[in-house]
Amino acid sequence: MAEPGFLSLTLIGALVFGYFLGSIPFGLILTRLAGLGDVRSIGSGNIGATNVLRTGNKKLAAATLIFDMLKGTVAVLVASRYGPDAAIGAGFGAFIGHLFPVWIGFKGGKGVATYLGVLIGLAWPGALVFAAVWIVTALLTRYSSLAALIASIVVPIALYSRGYPAIAVLFAIMTVIVIFKHKANITRLLNGTESKIGAKG
């Protein structure tokens, strides 16, 4: 049986590892490499895939989405070698790293793609629920933010009902953070001024 001190060090190490992996700003890196400048200067100013899509480059937006998801999935899978607690810690660290990346002044994305990536690594059935809810909501409304909010609210409930109580608690916490990070989007949704999927500028 592992000593409590070892468990604490492992969890701290997993959190730190996850944070630095999650803090890689792929949206910013990819748009600059493509010669599109600073993605933070357009649309919502966010470094995530939805804002990258506003450059008009769908392939770049897809690449951003995949890499931001992989940050969460890879963090979980690597840390899982040291136990489920380490996997959860690394996943949460990656999520926080994406939101508050040290490399760009702690001003990152809104965490949705990395949230999904962590979900894939910890409980992939929950990722199917997220994807289904997101797709249906996005098709009906054309609002990426609304789709993400509804999907992230459904996920913890689905996880708990499917027998993942510890992971459900983690995602309940992450969902609260996602909602907080979308407060400006929520205001725009209520005012009818939120940008729809595919809109430029």
Swiss-Prot record:
Q: In which pathway does it act?
A: Lipid metabolism; phospholipid metabolism
Tell me where in or outside the cell this protein is found.
Answer: Cell inner membrane
* Entry keyword set: Cell inner membrane, Cell membrane, Lipid biosynthesis, Lipid metabolism, Membrane, Phospholipid biosynthesis, Phospholipid metabolism, Transferase, Transmembrane, Transmembrane helix
Listed disulfide bonds for this chain?
A: none
Q: Which GO terms describe its molecular function?
A: acyl-phosphate glycerol-3-phosphate acyltransferase activity
GO term, biological process aspect, one: phospholipid biosynthetic process
Q: Where are the transmembrane segments?
A: 9-29, 60-80, 86-106, 116-136, 153-173
- EC nos: 2.3.1.275
Where does the source fall among the domains of life? Bacteria
**Leading EC class:** transferase
Q: Which InterPro entries match?
A: G3P_acylTferase_PlsY (IPR003811)
Looking up SMART domains in the UniProt record yields:
G3P_acyltransf
Q: How does the protein associate with the membrane?
A: Multi-pass membrane protein
Tell me where the signal peptide lies: none
Q: How does it assemble?
A: Probably interacts with PlsX.
- According to its UniProt record, which protein family does this protein belong to? Belongs to the PlsY family.
Q: HAMAP family, per this entry?
A: PlsY
Q: What does this protein do?
A: Catalyzes the transfer of an acyl group from acyl-phosphate (acyl-PO(4)) to glycerol-3-phosphate (G3P) to form lysophosphatidic acid (LPA). This enzyme utilizes acyl-phosphate as fatty acyl donor, but not acyl-CoA or acyl-ACP.
Q: What is this protein called?
A: Glycerol-3-phosphate acyltransferase
Q: Which organism is it from?
A: Brucella anthropi (strain ATCC 49188 / DSM 6882 / CCUG 24695 / JCM 21032 / LMG 3331 / NBRC 15819 / NCTC 12168 / Alc 37) (Ochrobactrum anthropi)
